[in-house]
Amino acid sequence: MAVLRSLLPQLGLFLCLALCFSPALSASYNDPCTVFDTISTTNLRVNITAEGSGENITYTVWVHVNSSVSVVILKAVNQDNKPVGTWVGATQECNDSSVLYRVTPSDNSDFQATWIVPNSEDITKVNLHVLMAIGNGTAAVTSVNLGEPQTSTPLRPTPEISETNQTTTMTTDKTPAMTTAKTPAMTTAKTTAKTTAKTTVKTTAMTTAKTTAKSLAVNALGSPLAGALHILLVFLISKLLF
């Protein structure tokens, strides 16, 4: 009995400490990153953009949220289910290598998170898991494979139009227009030029011939010397005949 009486103060102190630390132990066990009553798989609107070069690439992850979303949980893993990269500005790190961001409720806004990945990492083999807590122990989750082309995760720039396509377009568009525009104009111009030239030459030739003949007749009849020679010629012929 004496031994039990000596141990009572120590047992009381132990029970007191256990009661004090039990809330903390319970909180650490009930990780807010993993405890949800209902988790539904859905297609969330997720956009990812990349920038920077060198040893690290900085990715910006955009998640569309609404007023019912209070928490966004992000996790990036490779094919071996190992975490990839570092998340910047997370509110809390979870036990399963995911990170938790608390979101201020707002209507139709975009949540933004920064993700830094080593340049040596093959990003095409990474899966990005996005989970949104929407209250009452309910969450919506989606997974994005960064190696698959998706409209919601534009990691690669849009390919430019090839030179072959541009050449084909120019040939198709310009050739008919040029042919249609030039052919009637050239035909009309040539026909008009030929007709005008022929008419001008013919008119000029006829006018010149008539003018020359008329001028010769006038000159022959109107000149005094020509009249005198004509009279002399008539006189000589009459003398020879008679």
UniProtKB/Swiss-Prot annotation:
Listed GO CC annotations: apical plasma membrane; external side of plasma membrane
Keyword line: Cell membrane, Differentiation, Glycoprotein, GPI-anchor, Lipoprotein, Membrane, Signal
Expression (tissue specificity): Present at high level in the dermal sheath cells near the bulge area of the hair follicle and in the differentiated sebocytes of the normal adult skin (at protein level).
Expression induction or repression: Following tissue damages of the skin.
Location (main, coarse): membrane
Glycosylation sites (chain numbering): N47, N56, N66
Name listed for the protein in its UniProt record: Placenta-expressed transcript 1 protein
Organism taxonomic ancestry: Eukaryota, Metazoa, Chordata, Craniata, Vertebrata
